Each structure stands twice: as C-alpha cells, then as structure tokens.
Amino acid sequence: MGELSPVCLCLLLQGLLLCNTGAARNLNELKMECPHTIRLGQGLVVGSVELPSLPIQQVETLKLESSCNFDLHTSTAGQQSFTKWTWEIKGDLAENTQASSTSFQTKSSEVNLRGLCLIPTLVVETAARMRKTIACYDLSCNQTVCQPTVYLMGPIQTCITTKSCLLSLGDQRIQVNYEKTYCVSGQLVEGICFNPIHTMALSQPSHTYDIMTMMVRCFLVIKKVTSGDSMKIEKNFETLVQKNGCTANNFQGYYICLIGSSSEPLYVPALDDYRSAEVLSRMAFAPHGEDHDIEKNAVSAMRIAGKVTGKAPSTESSDTVQGIAFSGSPLYTSTGVLTSKDDPVYIWAPGIIMEGNHSICEKKTLPLTWTGFISLPGEIEKTTQCTVFCTLAGPGADCEAYSETGIFNISSPTCLINRVQRFRGSEQQIKFVCQRVDMDITVYCNGMKKVILTKTLVIGQCIYTFTSIFSLIPGVAHSLAVELCVPGLHGWATMLLLLTFCFGWVLIPTITMILLKILIAFAYLCSKYNTDSKFRILIEKVKREYQKTMGSMVCEVCQYECETAKELESHRKSCSIGSCPYCLNPSEATTSALQAHFKVCKLTSRFQENLRKSLTVYEPMQGCYRTLSLFRYRSRFFVGLVWCVLLVLELIVWAASAETQNLNAGWTDTAHGSGIIPMKTDLELDFSLPSSASYTYRRQLQNPANEQEKIPFHLQLSKQVIHAEIQHLGHWMDATFNLKTAFHCYGSCEKYAYPWQTAGCFIEKDYEYETGWGCNPPDCPGVGTGCTACGVYLDKLKSVGKVFKIVSLRYTRKVCIQLGTEQTCKTVDSNDCLITTSVKVCLIGTISKFQPSDTLLFLGPLQQGGLIFKQWCTTTCQFGDPGDIMSTPTGMKCPELNGSFRKKCAFATTPVCQFDGNTISGYKRMIATKDSFQSFNVTEPHISTSALEWIDPDSSLRDHINVIVSRDLSFQDLSETPCQIDLATASIDGAWGSGVGFNLVCTVSLTECSAFLTSIKACDAAMCYGSTTANLVRGQNTIHIVGKGGHSGSKFMCCHDTKCSSTGLVAAAPHLDRVTGYNQADSDKIFDDGAPECGMSCWFKKSGEWILGVLNGNWMVVAVLVVLLILSILLFTLCCPRRPSYRKEHKP
C-alpha cells in the first residue's frame, strides 16, 4: 500500500472532525430541577426534552436505553401493539382532478412499538416507595418524520444519588443533569421558590397566599374495573361539555399528572380535588394539549388534506376513528387510545390529528400524554441573608457565600462568580474567586450588599509571614506577629517602636556613625572645593597682573600660554634650543613638535605645584569638620538619651496614628464623654441624610448663666422606610410568537379546527375560495376552491414576574428625642414635624426616583430588587409593550396582535402566510434593553394586599432634615435627671483592630425612672470604638455594641458618657482565618456626640494601656524583647568600650 497523499490526509482529518461535530449535535440535555433539601414523602421529580426529528421508518426500531445508576421501571420498555393509521392520495385519480373529500384514503396496520408512555396501574404511585424511575417517550409525527419527546419521572431521592447520566433513543444521546435549585423544598417559578398548597385557597383569605401558573404533565393510565362507570373517563369529559346520549365510550382509565418540576401525583378526574377539575376542564377545551408545537417550529406551515376516517384496529370491518389529515410541521402527539373500546386500542397516527372533540359521540381518542398549565395557590419560601467570607489565596482571595435557605441572587463587580454550588442539608454554598485585593470586596447576595475588608486579609498574610520568620520561637511567633501586622502608619510605628526597644543600643550608634561619616565627607568636599577654587582665582589674578606690567604670557616659539613668570622664562630658554621647559628632554624647536610633546609630558603642572607649595597649606580641621570629627557618638549618655527620647516620640506617634479618618457614615474613634453646647442661641441642625443611614446626635446643653446646669439631649433618626400603596396588576407572562399557515385544497375555512384556536391568545385571517392559479400547488389543482388560513397565536406561556402599580408614596423616619427626663417619639412623614415645647424635628423633603403611577416589576424575590417602569399598559396593550400578557385573578389578558397578514404566492407552490407586525414579546424586549430601565434594591420588605414597605439599601434617596432646639429651656427642671445607669460587661466576641470588629454585650441597669433614651459606647481606657442607641427600660437591659478598632491591650468596657463598667474584656487577635463580610446597611450609621478627639494625655494613656496589655499577655514576648535588649546592650559594650579617663590617660 502506497503512502497517503497530503490531499487524502486532509480529507481524512476533515471527515473525523465532521464526525465529532455530528456526535456533538446528537447530544441533548434533559434538566431535572430539584430542591436542595430532600425530605421523605415529597413525591416525584419530572423533566422532559424534545429531540430532533427522525425518519418515520426508524420509529419501529426505537428503544430507550439508560446508563444511569438509578433503577428503571421495566414496564414501559416492553413491546406494545399499535394500530398505525396513515393517509395518502388515491392512486387512481386522473391528472388535474380537482381535490375533494374523496381524493384521499387511509390505511391501517399493526406495528409493535416499545418505550412509549404506556404506564401501567400503580407504577407511578409506587415509584417513590420502590425507588423506581420511569423513562418513556412520545411521538409527534407527520407523514415522513417524527419528533420524539422524552419524559423522565423518578423519586425525588434520585436528586441525591444522581448528578448526571446518559439516556439514548436511537442515535440521539440525552444528558440527564440533576440541578439543585436554591429552593429548600419549593419549585422555581418567576425566580422565586414557590410551594404550591392547593388547600390554602379553601381555608385562607386571598391576600394571605400567592397564585402562580405552573406546567402540568399528564400521562394516561389504563385501569379496568368489573362494574360501574367510575373509571370511564370519557363520561367525565362529556358531562363537562354537556354532551348527552353517548353510550359507546367504554374505555376505562385516568390521567396521572405531575405539577411543575416535582410534586405528588395528581389524579384526573378526582372529585375531591379542585386541581383535578381545573385540569379536566383544560383538557376538554384543548384536547391535544396547551403546548402546541416545539420552539423551532414557531413559524411554519401545514397542509390540510381534510377529514379522514379509518379502522382501529386494522381488523375492524368499519371505520372506528377519525381525524384531520395533514402534512408539514408536526404539532400534537400522534399517539392515542380509542375511547369506544373496553380493551385499550392504541393508535399511532403519523400525519393525522386524531379527533378529540368531546362534544361528539363517536370515533374519538384520548392522547397518551397531555401538557398544559394550571394556576395554583401557595406560599413563597422565606429567604435568609447570606454569609460571605474570604481567605487570601495567592494574589487574590478565595471566597464562599452560603445561606440557610438558598442563594437566589449573587453578583460582584470585583469577583468571578462561577456558580459552583454545594449543599449541606438546607444550606447552599457557592465558591468564587476574587482576583484583586487592593480594594474592598463587594458582593451582592440575596438582596444584601456585603463588604469584605481586604486589608484584614493582608493582615492575615502578614501574620502568616512573620510567624514563619519567627518559627524558631513558636511560643511568641504569633503574638509578636499580631503586634507587628497592623495596617498603615500605626503598623510601621509599632515596628519602629519594637526595633528601637530591642536593638536601639546597637542601631543608634551605628546609624549615628554612618550619618557622621556622610556629613564629614560632605564637609571635607565642600572645604576642598573652596580651597581649589581660591587657588585657581589666585593664579588668574597673578596672570592678569603680569600681563598688565610685563606684557604677553605666550611663548614666542611654542605659542603656549603660561601662568607664571618662572614658567614663561623657562619657555624662552628651552623652546628656542629644542628642549622641553618642563622635563628638559630634547625636541625639535618647532611649534607643532613642542605642542605635541606637551600633550604627553607629565610635568606640565610643575610650576603650579611649586607655587601651591610656596603658599600656606590648608588644614581642614576647623569649624564644622572638626566638630563632626570629634563628636562622641559612642557615649553611653548620648545613646541612652536618644534611646529614651525615641521611645517616647514613637509611643506618641503610635497612639496618634491609631485614629481613623472622619467619615460621613460610620464610627469615628473619639475620647470618652460627649460635647457641650452653651445655649446662647437656638441650636439648629440642617442636613441631608441618605435613606439607608440612621442618625444619632447627642450633646450636653449648658445653661450660659450657670455652667453647672446641663441637660442631656439625645436625637435618634432611624432609617427611611418607603411606604407604597400598591395595586397588584398580576403576573407578567412571556410567550413564543407563532405564525402558522394552514392550507387545504377544498372546503371552507370554518370546516376544520386549526391548532391556534385552542390557544389563549390568537388572531386568524382566512383567504377562502380565491380565484387564480397562482396560489395552488401542482398536487392540488383547481380554481375557486379551498382555503389558506393564516394564524398568529402565543404559545408556551411562562410567568416571569410580579407587577405592582404605585398608587401613592410616603417616606417616613422614626424620630425619638430625649431631653432631660422628657422622651418623645413619632414616625415623621415628608413635610411633617415632631414638635415639643422645646424641640422641633422636621422632614422637609425627599429626593426620590419613585413617583406615583410608576409600575414596579419584580423578576424574583422582593429582596432581589426590581425595575421601575414609567410606561406600563393596563387597558389596551399591544404585543411587545411592557405588560402585554398578564395573568390576573380574573383570567388571562391577551394583547392586541397588531399587524396585517399577507399571503405570499408563487406558481405551483404552497402559499405561505406573512405577518408584518411585531413578533417579539414585551418581556424579551425588556431583557434586551434592561440597562435602560431604572432599578432599585430592597431590604426588609413587607407586603400585604394593598401595601408594600421597604428600605432602600443603596442610599439612592435622601431626606432633608431640620432640627431646632430652643434656647429657652427649663434648665432648673430638666437638668436634674434622676435616672441612674449602672453598666457591666457580659461578654465579647470578635477581634480588635479596625478591620475585623467585635461585638460587646453589655448589661445596663436603669433605676429611678421608667424609660431613658441614650447611647452606650464600647471603649477602652483611652478611646471609644462603637456605640448603639438604646431605649432603656426600668431594670436589666441587654445591649449589643458592634465596634471596630483597639489594640492588643484594649480592655473593652461598656460606657455611658464618662461612666464605664468596672471591668473590661479583651477581644481576640486578628488572625489568618476567614474574614466575614458585613452588611453595608448595618454600617450606614451616622453617630455624632461631639466627644473630644484623642489628645496628648489620651495618647499616653493609650500607649500605657498597650504596654500593660503586652505585659499581661504572653509574658514570653516580653521576656524575648528584654533578652534582645540585653544582648544589644552587651554588643554595644563590646563594640564601643568605655574610654579611659583623662587622668589615667595623661598620668605622668
């Protein structure tokens, strides 16, 4: 065999690639949505997938196979006899014969099919108990191809045992993926977790539950009973459509339905369940199903041959079944069972829509599968907040978010969220990576904004590094690293302080010596430079004086300009005889030869050097140089003095650098106490406050006439609450736009029932009995006969969101004031005030993006936020408008499908309908332009039938606040406050440091008065790091204070003004463990009590507390530092021995 040519190799490689591509196209996904908490008795999980079409010749050999690890029920895998009922044009028709009802004929034959959805009795009912899974398929066929739909039903426990597996049907591969949603036990509808509870509509008022539209998949089950008509399902349909006199429909069975993605089986019909009655009525209206065709056939055409009859089974002597013969895109299921037989007769009718009209008596069938929709009441699962934490990993951070009830929404502007999920019980976890830690990590999770302070991560990495460096002394490694790893100038000050304390006796003389050497060299260079400059100036002056008195200084022979008279005289003597005046070596007595010799002569500076030596020699030992040279930097007194001064200065810098910057929102470290304001004039505050921020203002109001009389004043403004009176408009629906052409050769357009006529929203235009040959295909001759029916309808309706219209809006804040012993609270509305005899607090106005008549759309839970629509149609809606398709309690509201039909014709071809109106739903349009709509976030929502309340977490709204306190206060009455407050520290958790934060639990006792509004702070001996406003009642009160800051020696106490608890607690040290994010909304607190800033005494107190904390902490750290100090002093003594005394040095 010869070598393959490059062309053959290329073709072979291309063939392999095409084979791989073909194999990839044969892979289909079947998604099984599971709640992430599986409990016993939760029924079945169901899913389906529509496969590509296959030739009708392959149907009889189809077999559904599985490689999944679950146990498949074998009942549906066996062969079952079907009557194959087909149609064709009669072969004896003459050419150009006009089509009529007698132009077509049908054929019946018996075939065996396996794997179709023929579910025996009790199979579904016992599937959960027996841990059996049911896999089957159904067929939608025309004359040439069939489109299979594969169904998978299994116990919900398979969500735990199976993640992914493969099914196969013919040459198609089906990837079954079990996906756990963020729902605990409910189903994902409209982006929210919905638990359908049908009994709620019977026992509770309508405003206490929600109503959702859910898909229903039903499967026909045959069950024969020996007597009675209880199982004759067709009797129920006939009763429903009020058809009497039908006695021949004796088929016995029922439908078993599954609602949504998982549910308990629903039996249809069932007298004691209104859900069953609803499904039954929908089956009667749409006997072939409410899902009309597959997505890719949304715009297609069909040719109707007409009504046909046939025999089922094929051995019958007369016709027992009828239907509508067609060609073109397949629509509904092509499998059914005959209603007139006691024993089930299964029919497979490719290219025929079998009769399903229950208002007639004969030749009817029931489909083996039925798909539709049903509206059910239920409850929405409550959501919980996320917990987000991060750990440092390489150049970025590894983060994880988890929630007890699932994560319905998570995003981040700084991280890559890959949706890798884990579930532990009811808890959902998502891991993601943040590539940058040079800025704080922001994560939006379950409607909450979480912020992870990345400097805390860097602190952890610093601790890890220093712990590794000091690993030889593990007992002190971590403690020492914790002290050193403090961010900012404070951390550098700590490091310098420890270096000075431990190694100051070595570093001080060493650094001083280096500085002195540099200064001495600089002084010498400056002095040397000045000497040379003066010498050159002197030579120039001598030269100029000689030129003035004696003439030119240029040698006449060599033309060299001399600088002194002796040099010129030597030139005159030597150059004329050809000798060098400098080295006296012989040369030619020419200018060029002598100048060339001067360039290499090494003694040309001989006369300058003689002149320099004749002058006084410079001795650079005076002034600065001498002082620097004689400085005794090794003196013990000098080193000890500098060491003490540096320690004091560094302690001050260390304490001062611990202060944080002033912020508009958040806590600012201050000293103890509160500010004092002399009431010489009225106290007025006028400011703008973000909607998500609370505000605390506390002062001591002082009598200007008597400084001893002071009244405590406390003002508390809570976060803004938005109150909207709403009108529930219903649920916005998305739909697939379908355009169908139905052409048939003869008869009027009303003669047949077209598929869109059972759709909820449709329009139809008929082109009937048109004259002209241009619109007739060759196999349908004739002029002025037949019909082309054009239909537009909306299919695959899907609920996408809740819609509320704002009727009115209010913005409120709760305002509380405490003036002396007087306390007043009121919820203040816009343009409203809280007024007392001395204080007036007004909410003047609000800057808002909401307006009455706006429409709010929620595409998920309320906590996920929503979109604001300024234009929302409520009465006359066109398809494509916001609010075009709405599901309301009164029923479905269909939009106007504005546009006109046009029949496109060509000679000898089937006509095609065209529609020039909009074909994109309003929801799809909104998604394409989602960024153009205003969005808003929601925190702490509360909803009722006609009201919606929430807090804006983004501070996108602002309130204008005005506060006036009159100067005419009754100081004699209000300054005498009988309230006595005692404080005790109960517990603390968290860590000191500005990044991590701590939670201090205080026990506050109030006596001598019934209630008192004040603020309790978390402080150490020097400063305060957090506060909370508390409305104390008589007796014991437990107060939680969240603070950030402090140091390793801080003993956090509970303080009120200048009074603190007797004992304090030490928080944990920051470490390398995961850093948990905090709610941005919780930190939006503005606290202003006018307390003085930390001054000099506060700095020393803070430094002293830190030193005591170090001493009282890990004593080994202090021991190691002292040992290092002693070693450095010994090293200093060895390197810088004491100088002998002057007397001993000059002893005679």
Swiss-Prot record:
Residues 767-787 are annotated as: Fusion loop. Keywords: Disulfide bond, Fusion of virus membrane with host endosomal membrane, Fusion of virus membrane with host membrane, Glycoprotein, Host endoplasmic reticulum, Host Golgi apparatus, Host membrane, Host mitochondrion, Host-virus interaction, Inhibition of host innate immune response by virus, Inhibition of host RLR pathway by virus, Inhibition of host TRAFs by virus, Membrane, Metal-binding, Phosphoprotein, Repeat, Signal, Transmembrane, Transmembrane helix, Viral attachment to host cell, Viral immunoevasion, Viral penetration into host cytoplasm, Virion, Virus entry into host cell, Zinc, Zinc-finger. Disulfide bonds join C34-C159, C68-C165, C117-C136, C141-C146, C183-C193, C218-C257, C386-C445, C390-C399, C415-C434, C462-C485, C745-C780, C749-C787, C761-C894, C775-C905, C790-C913, C816-C825, C833-C842, C873-C877, C979-C1009, C1002-C1054, C1019-C1024, C1055-C1060, C1094-C1098. The keyword Nuclease does not apply. Residues 526-543, 598-615, 602-613, 621-635, 1131-1143, 1131-1148 are annotated as: Binding to the ribonucleoprotein. Residues 518-637, 1137-1148 are cytoplasmic. The record marks A658, E659 as: Cleavage. This is Envelopment polyprotein. A motif (YxxL) lies at residues 625-628. A zinc finger (CCHC-type) spans 555-575, 580-601. Residues 24-496, 659-1115 are lumenal. One of its GO terms (biological process) is virion attachment to host cell. Residues 1-23 form the signal peptide. Residues 621-644 form the ITAM domain. It holds the Pfam family Hanta_Gn-B. It comes from Puumala virus (strain P360). One of its GO terms (cellular component) is host cell Golgi membrane. One of its GO terms (molecular function) is zinc ion binding. Glycans are attached at N142, N357, N409, N937. The keyword Mitochondrion does not apply. Belongs to the hantavirus envelope glycoprotein family. The chain crosses the membrane at residues 497-517, 638-658, 1116-1136.
